[in-house]
Amino acid sequence: MAVVIRLLGLPFIAGPVDIRHFFKGLTIPDGGVHIIGGKVGEAFIIFATDEDARRAISRSGGFIKDSSVELFLSSKVEMQKTIEMKRTARVGRGRPGSGASGVGNVYHFSDALKEEESYSGYGSSVNRDAGFHTNGTGLDLRPRKTRPLKAENPYLFLRGLPYLVNEDDVRVFFSGLCVDGVILLKHHDGRNNGDAIVKFASCVDASGGLKCHRSFMGSRFIEVMQGSEQQWIEFGGTATEGGDTPRMRSEEHSPSRRINGRHFRKRSHSKSPRARSRSPLGFYVHLKNLSLNTNKRDLRNLFRDTDLTNDQIKFVYKDERRTRYAFVMFKNQKDYNTALGLHKTVLQYRPVLIDPVSRKEMVRIIECYEKKRPESLEKERPGRVSQKYSQEGFSGSGQKLCIYIRNLPFDVTKGEVQKFFADFSLVEDDIYLLCDDKGVGLGEALVRFKSEEQAMKAERLNRQRFLGIEVLLRLISEEQMQEFGIKSSWLSNERTQACSRSHDGDDCSCLFDLKDPSSCSFGQSESLRYHPKDLRKMGHFKHPQGYFRQSDRCSPEDFRHSPEDYRHPWEEHTSHSREEDWRLPLEDWPQEDDFRQCHEKDHRQLRSPWEEDFRRPSQEHFRRSYQEHIRRPPQEHFRRSREEDFRHVADEDFRQASDEDFRISQEDLRYPTDEDFRRVSVEDLREVPEKDLRLPKNFRSSGEEFWTPPDFRGQHPFVNFDHLQGGKFDFEKYKLENFHDGKFVPDLKFNCGSGGIIRVMISNLPFKANANEILDFFHGYKVIPDSVSIQYNEEGLPLGEAIVSMTNYNEALSAVKDLSGRPVGPRKVKLSLL
């Protein structure tokens, strides 16, 4: 469909060829260029398609014959009327503003232009001015061939102003006339659109302003036409009170509409150049990216050119916390446009984004952010108990003192959780690690704080990275914590222990069924039963499936993988009141029973080591032999076979041992002590050559046929690898007699021989070094291929160290002497014997 473009600023010497050359690449049909000429250099160009018209508009500001031209969307109706008036109207062309050759009379044909606009994809400049009638009313009159010589009201509308114009420039343009006010119209983004409405002191001054029609302001000509009070009020002006100024009004212009601008604009039939603007009618703006320290005074200073009060500013809150959003309401269009012009203005080192917004959208955003949620009610006022728990009788327990942590590593320890909350005075008894029924960690924990204020501060660590993982924190109450098997009072665990100590074995036997499958076997004939509260005191939730048999349990709401077997009442397991044992002093509490002297007694009151982070092992662990729970076997057991050593342990060997020897701790289950290694001499190991890992009978020089135990990963002749975690031994922690500062000092009495396996430590390696590079470094030396072990820290990052195993001592000593100080990549490595 053909689209008409209006061109202004065409030089006198330019012709149709120059215009076609200017629009080179765009399709202009034959006869599509119509040059009107005149002082403004007007012309109309017809383009074949909408796309060509869009591309043509983008060339506005270009040059034709060294003259800048401007392009506007137009229509065939405007073009035809302009050509017709150019040919017929010749009166008054010598005086500016009075000639019939002007385009001002075109603006009376609003009905014809509406029809053109209905099928055109563009809003032409004529269409935007269709509502400006010279009599100041909304009535459509017949076209007149001459411009009025006298103004009907003191308001004039200006078109074609430079985009950088200000009010002073307009007053200079009307020099000699009394101008009361100027309103510069703007786009929705705050930029001037080249239009303005001017209010004069009287109609006489306004009539003088009409004579400035088509006068130049700088390099641009200005169109001056009659305005109306409606337009002045609509664009931010105030209504003139009194009837001193002569005006022509219709009966529909009532004072109430002039006072209430919003109601007037809603019902007015006059059209203005801003009729197609995207600006909202409510004069609301949405401020974004504000600093959290910004207050209303700062915003008033930002909009200092507007009439703004504190009541017109609204900050947006979410869960009683300030956000970076705010809304501002302006009273008139002028202030509204001024505010939009401050888009991306820097306020407190942050660019403030100012966008127009409707009242409906503003209300929706505020309700969305400030809608109170049930879980946020407890965080609003520290120390306040929610009505829900108060009505149910939970006077103090409704406070949210606990933090529920998720997304932790499955093998996290209490000490690590305690380090995460290093800013809070927590003890390990305040931390509970959740495990499944097999003893495997769930990656979840419960932490209790002394006050609700501390818990709220700890919740700020939500989504912080811990051990390389982003953890999730949630504030919960003690009632919600009970759903995990934790009593509302944190002292309930200690009370349970006191009660259990005050009972003897016969009194406590009623707590469990004799056929309870949760009995934990420590040997072939002995069985020990653990009370669940003992394990809960340790901070873990591992529980066999046979402890409790309640059928009315259900999963707690809003939590994942919660233990379910600890929701029984506390009173079920005690035969007397809670306060009975607490009335006794600490020194009068009954002593613990020693299960080594009486195997038939119930040992639920077994004391757990508070200083160690003990995670209860799985149920299969308690079916193992005594060797799993004995820290220091007799010396002669080293000369027996492994099966004989741990299956036939006489009871008399342990009856006279101290209590400390039988305290179950994490160290007893995983690591031997220094004394174990010092008691084992080299001569003792030589007596059992088939158990000497350095001299196996079936050893061969090939790395593929090298015999090692199944758990072997870091061989040392003095270590029983069945007790080590992951088959590794910490040489730094457990330094033996021949190890000084991490270096191997050979024993002259010990015959290393050629069949012994020697470990070599490589230090100062590049962090990106791999096993192949290390093997290439030892090229020519007898290194066991699969023995290269690169050391990593707790976070999984390389330490720049590695350990390799060599076939004999002489080969290792030669490698240390020859290769120490040589480079591996950019670094010089250091070798030492282990």
Swiss-Prot record:
Which residues are reported to carry the modification Phosphoserine?
701
Where is the region Disordered?
Answer: 237-277, 546-572, 621-643
Q: What are the protein's UniProt keywords?
A: Phosphoprotein, Repeat, RNA-binding
CDD domains linked to this entry: RRM2_RBM12B (cd12746), RRM4_RBM12B (cd12748)
One Pfam family in the UniProt entry? RRM_1
Classification via SMART domains? RRM
Tell me where in this chain the RRM domain is found: 154-229, 283-359, 401-478, 758-834
Annotated Basic and acidic residues bias: 244-255, 550-572
Molecular function terms from GO: RNA binding
Q: Does the keyword Nucleus apply?
A: no
Protein name (record): RNA-binding protein 12B-B
Taxonomic lineage: Eukaryota, Metazoa, Chordata, Craniata, Vertebrata
